[in-house]
Amino acid sequence: MRAELAHANTPAIVRAWISQPPQWLEVVSLKQPVDSALAHLEAGEREAISLASELQAILLLMDERDGVTIARHRGLKVVGTLAALDLAAAHGLVELQTMFERLRATTFRSPVRLMVSMLEQDAERKKRQEG
């Protein structure tokens, strides 16, 4: 996965981030070979699903539709990037608007109306917390 983030086709902002990752990021290698049944997926998804299974992870962060379907079929709990950011925003760890702006600087794509709806819900949540 690290190689995918550092690839020349990856946006510069992402390559810069992975070149000096935050201290909380732990890079873990697979102990077993990648499951050959996942060969039709991209390398990052194959490795993520295999590692999540190997580690018996409680949660897998993944957005690629085919990978999500297979991971869930294998009993893994999967959350997408937007849901993870929304959860972090709900706990006051990030500012959702800022995170969405940063995502737009990458190759990440999501329906604009979904992101607008999430920002509206975030604003409502903040009002409830204030008042």
Model-flagged regions — what are they?
Residues L76-D86:
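Short hydrophobic/aromatic-enriched beta-strand-loop microsegments
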Residues E64-R65, L82:
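Alpha-helix N-cap/helix-start capping motif
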Residues M1-L59, R65-K77, T98, R102-R104, ...:
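Active-site-proximal, substrate-binding regions of enzyme catalytic domains
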